[in-house]
Amino acid sequence: MSKPQNPVQMAVIGAAHGIKGELRVKTFTGEPMALADYGPLYARDGRAFQITDIRPANTVVVVRFKGISDRNAAEALAGTELFVDRSMLPDDGEEDEFYHADLVGLEVRDDTGTALGKVVAVHNFGGGDILDVTLAGRKGVLIPFTQAAVPDVSVAEGFVRVDPVAAGLVEDEDGDAPREEDFDPKGRPRGPRDAGGNR
């Protein structure tokens, strides 16, 4: 396969590990070891990387790529983002699940349809998925990816609709922020999937 036409980021190469060309790699797959299941991975410039060995190491995997046999060659790859074509990813058909790559770049609208900004990243710091949104004329904000805060997602039409009160962008009519008792942790069965799901 050549350079992906519809790329989805699967990993980013970190620091060299040892002196024999191994690298620490942060994966965005549901199961980190599944990174090797996708065949060649591609850098933005089209270079292909074939995994010849992979093993777990704390929060990353240690990978050996074909043709990378010493520390100097490995160090030169630090920071390289690795992609596969979207067609290589499983489509589980779950209506309320999305790949991070599906959400990044979507326009953010309020309940009236007014454009507020764009999704620039998706994070999960351990408490649930969060959309990183840049708003027109304001600094970026973090919006919880919950049913209350983000009631509608339309990847096909290129937008997410947020409830400004539930998203914490404005106070409600009484001047109150959203109440803790209004929080329903099961309110959104969906959530951004890491690339590749649990393949």
Swiss-Prot record:
Pfam families: PRC, RimM. Its main location: cytoplasm. GO terms for cellular component: cytoplasm; ribosome. GO terms for molecular function: ribosome binding. Residues 167-199 are annotated as: Disordered. It comes from the Bacteria. Keywords: Chaperone, Cytoplasm, Ribosome biogenesis, rRNA processing. The keyword Chaperone applies. Residues 176-193 have a biased composition (Basic and acidic residues). GO terms for biological process: ribosomal small subunit biogenesis; rRNA processing. Residues 95-168 form the PRC barrel domain. It is found in: Cytoplasm. NCBIfam families: 16S_RimM. Binds ribosomal protein uS19. Belongs to the RimM family. An accessory protein needed during the final step in the assembly of 30S ribosomal subunit, possibly for assembly of the head region. Essential for efficient processing of 16S rRNA. May be needed both before and after RbfA during the maturation of 16S rRNA. It has affinity for free ribosomal 30S subunits but not for 70S ribosomes. The PRC barrel domain binds ribosomal protein uS19. This is Ribosome maturation factor RimM. The gene is rimM.
